[in-house]
Regions:
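Conserved G1/Walker A P-loop phosphate-binding module
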Residues: 1, 11-28, 136-218
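N-terminal accessory targeting/assembly segments
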Residues: 1-79
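Conserved nucleotide-binding/hydrolysis micro-motifs of P-loop NTPases
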Residues: 26-29, 40-43, 72-75, 102-106, ...
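Canonical P-loop GTPase G-domain recognition
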Residues: 105-159
Length: 218
């Protein structure tokens, strides 16, 4: 059936994280869930639809917190992208933690840039964590912050979302890919947002890499 959410014109009226009321439709040995109602959302994250500029795409709903993964290079995450994303999460009342990922790969000048960015964002109240999945640096810190919550991981393609998720919950075994040498950008491994129940009383929403983030109706 078709669903319309009051006040929202989106390409996907049902999103990852939605809570719904449904009926079971049984045909032979197969049962299919038929959604009857979408329960009012506590919050949601949206971005402009790529092909339909007047419409939006709901990335996920009912989120307790977001981990925004940032890399200084391979690929670079620019401050303009970070700021637009933080404006959106603040507007929708979603706590956001900045994860400076691949910390083991940076040279001295790149480390200085991370410290500069951390000073800026910590001064306005955002928690910043330096993480290395390969060296297991602060992976447990991220994991502890996730307990009892639904967390969304987001960032550009290639920032190491899937690698970090695998370090947190190895049984998920999410696919990862190397950075494209030609374009210095990540290659998509996650093609749609997906929620996973984790073994330590937490849920994670893994999202596709985002090239740009357009603010909508704020």
């Amino acid at each position: 059936g078709k669903f319309r959410i009051s006040g929202i014109k989106s390409t996907n009226p049902i999103a990852v994280g939605d809570k719904v009321i449904f009926d079971l439709d049984k045909k032979g040995d197969e049962e299919t869930g038929v959604i009857k109602k979408i329960i009012d959302r506590d919050n949601f994250i949206v971005r402009k639809s790529v092909n339909l500029s007047k419409q939006i795409h709901i990335i996920a709903a009912n989120i307790d917190q977001v981990f925004l993964l940032i890399t200084i290079n391979n690929p670079p995450t620019f401050a303009a992208f970070i700021d637009r994303f933080l404006v959106s999460t603040r507007a929708y009342r979603i706590d956001t933690i900045l994860v400076f990922n691949k910390i083991d790969t940076y040279k001295l000048e790149e480390r200085a840039e991370i410290l500069y960015l951390k000073d800026i964002y910590e001064a306005i109240g955002y928690r910043c964590i330096e993480v290395s999945s390969t060296e297991n640096k602060n992976v447990d810190t991220v994991k502890e912050l996730m307990i009892g919550k639904t967390s969304m991981f987001v960032g550009h393609s290639g920032v190491g979302k899937s690698t970090l998720v695998n370090a947190i919950e190895p049984s998920l075994d999410l696919k990862t890919k190397e950075i494209s040498e030609q374009h210095k950008q990540g290659q998509h491994t996650t093609t749609f947002a997906e929620m996973f129940d984790l073994s330590f009383n937490a849920r994670i929403i893994d999202t596709p890499g985002i090239k740009g983030f357009g603010i909508v109706d704020i």
